């Protein structure tokens, strides 16, 4: 089995609620996602995704992912995607570092490996947990009232944890107090 085609797609992912960071100076309403589709000569198709925060927040950003994939693609064409370590070595040769750009390719290769083996990817990696884990919401509202409202909505939808980032440091104590009545103790995690 060999990688025969790599397709890259840019997708805007709108956020349900605006997310504020850096003391209310950065507002995110949409994330720049990159989807990678890897096809093989035997008809298998694997998908991977990279969705970092905006380029003003972390070095990883959507255009960087896409440029990195363009750089690495010639080095991994023709390789067996099930031999993930070989693919990783080829990516490292083409572009040292830049894990955020390699991750979507890695995911797509694992997707193909799981499909071709007929098992979930978790089984290929040593077995998944059958114990349910709580899912955390992520809240970055600008005011205490907005934070509480968004946390209440997530809680009503079944989220057992919430992580929040205060848009202004001065509201941190008030957000902590407001969130403790929405979520049980130790289930609210400030960033």
What are these model-derived regions, one by one?
Residues 1, 67, 103, 131, ...:
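Structured loop/turn residues at beta-strand edges in well-structured enzyme cores
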Residues 1-5, 9-11, 89-92, 114-115, ...:
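N-terminal amphipathic alpha-helix/helix-capping segment at the start of soluble metabolic enzymes
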Residues 1-45, 51-56:
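Structured beta-strand/loop patches that form or line metal/cofactor-binding pockets in enzymes
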Residues 5, 39-116:
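Metal- or metallocofactor-binding catalytic centers and their adjacent structured scaffolds
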Residues 24, 97-99, 138-139, 168:
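A generic structural signal for short
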Residues 33-35, 44-47, 102, 132, ...:
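A common structural microfeature
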Residues 100-101, 106-142, 146:
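Glycine-rich, aromatic-flanked loop segments that form ligand/cofactor-binding clefts
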Residues 126-191:
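Metal-dependent enolase-superfamily TIM-barrel catalytic cores that perform enediolate-based chemistry
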């Amino acid at each position: 089995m060999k990688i025969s085609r790599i397709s890259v797609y840019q997708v805007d992912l709108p956020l349900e609620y605006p997310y504020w960071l850096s003391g209310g100076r950065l507002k995110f309403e949409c994330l720049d996602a990159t989807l990678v589709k890897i096809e093989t000569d035997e008809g298998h198709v694997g998908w991977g995704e990279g969705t970092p925060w905006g380029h003003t927040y972390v070095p990883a950003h959507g255009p960087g992912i896409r440029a990195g994939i363009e750089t690495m693609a010639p080095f991994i064409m023709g390789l067996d995607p099930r031999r993930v370590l070989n693919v990783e070595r080829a990516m490292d040769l083409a572009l040292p570092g830049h894990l955020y750009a390699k991750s979507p390719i890695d995911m797509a290769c694992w997707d193909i490996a799981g499909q071709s083996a007929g098992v979930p990817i978790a089984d290929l990696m040593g077995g998944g947990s059958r114990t349910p884990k709580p899912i955390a919401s992520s809240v970055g509202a600008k005011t205490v009232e907005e934070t509480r409202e968004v946390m209440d909505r997530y809680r009503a939808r079944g989220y057992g944890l919430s992580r929040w980032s205060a848009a202004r440091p001065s509201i941190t104590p008030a957000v902590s107090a407001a969130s403790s009545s929405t979520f049980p103790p130790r289930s609210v995690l400030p960033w």
